[in-house]
Amino acid sequence: MEIVNVLLFLIILFLVKDFVKKNKKIHTKSPSGPIAFPILGNVVQIRFWELFKIQEHELIGNYSKKYNGVVRAWIGERLFLFVSNYDVVKYFQKDENFLYRPSLLVPGWRYASSNGLGVMSSSDDEWKRAKSSVSQSLRVHTSKKLMEEKAIEFIDSLEKISNNNEIFYPKGHIQGYACSMLFKYMFNQDLSVESGMSRTIGNAVEHVFGNLSKLTAFDCFEIFSPLYDWFFTRRLKGCDIVRQIISSQNENHLKSIDPSKPRDLMDDLLIEYGLNEITKEDTMQINQICFDIFGPAVGTVTITMNWVILQLCNRPELQEIAYQEIKKAVKDDEYVNLNHKQNAPYIVAFIKETMRLCSNGFGLPRTAKNDQICGDFFIPKDAIIFINYLEISQNEEIFKNAKEFNPTRYLDESLPVPNIHFGVGQRACPGRFVAIDKMFLGISNLLLKYKLKSQNGEKIDDTIHFSVSLKAKDYGIKLEKRI
């Protein structure tokens, strides 16, 4: 009986200690948050509100308003900060203390990043080297001609669907478009926009995005650490599918590379990391850099273009404005090219407005290398920080009439708006300009050839579904040829 009493006392003591640890402020400016329960932390509130169909990003948004834009949340043993206070975000833009990724702190991200490698998850000099290599390669190997040719191939692949009056399901076709362009840049390999490989990669990336967006007990409790690899090998199967493709390309490039004539990103990376002197660790870094590019180049582009098409269908009057602008810009040309972009600012603004309201969620996590005061808030070392881009985008102090879909807000130079579509600061996506060009070509050529309509004449469901980015439900539309 005494042993039972002692065990009961120790359990109660642990619960009290854990409760105090999670709720006690360690600094007068420590961020506040909802009551964190022992062991589970704020998982209790997340699961409770899910019963009432309130999604995680909605709940965090509500807390953001209550706690002045910086929400402290304990997910199991991990301390998270969700930041939508733009004054605090500005510190993240310019301060090197916030350049670091917490990939070794969250097991799911650790697995997806090969233990903190790549351009997304590495830090310090390794990250700077990776980013520099990718940025330079993008400038050399991403040509206007390549993007324009792939956009034409994408549009031409829809001819059969239109002629047969079939329903067009954008997501799969956009995945093919994005993968096809990426394969040429990354591996100098021609891949049809309709190829099975494109769909396989697109589905794998979507699988990874979806599963990384939801933290599991394995992410939040150290006690499960012996089972991390076993669990995430099964949960994140999409990672292994993409990695196998990249590894095969790496081996093939080593056999055929001419250092004096690099063909693509893989060649550039092999040369950068020493070619014949490449170690196993270098190979892992090269492959992870390529893996990291698949995410935004395929996943983010697909999600965003999918949203843009949905918004164009739901707003036929704005679709007509975009079409008339494009038609005027191209004149007698059969297809839209990047030379037309300067005369088609509205469609670029439409893409940015869609990203503002629909596709930007929490982005990728970062962490503080050291404790730091950021304005009215104390940011502790090793806290896992997510910038809540969706909440920032709906802040009336930053965006006038923030909840209104209004692309023209990006056309008025007297009213500058924050450029947060691809992250902030030095950690912003190095391929963001290529991504905009890719989406511009795909969407504008689609509009030039077809009027986009919902299947039944009613608005398409635009409910947001939480992921690494915020995605729309799968939907189909009608393609009506323009005369």
From Swiss-Prot:
Binding residue positions for heme: 429
PROSITE patterns the UniProt entry points to: CYTOCHROME_P450
Topology relative to the membrane: Single-pass membrane protein
InterPro entries noted in UniProt: Cyt_P450 (IPR001128), Cyt_P450_CS (IPR017972), Cyt_P450_E_grp-I (IPR002401), Cyt_P450_sf (IPR036396)
Gene Ontology CC annotations of this record: membrane
Main location: membrane
Needed cofactors: heme
Family: Belongs to the cytochrome P450 family.
Protein name: Probable cytochrome P450 517A4
Species annotation: Dictyostelium discoideum (Social amoeba)
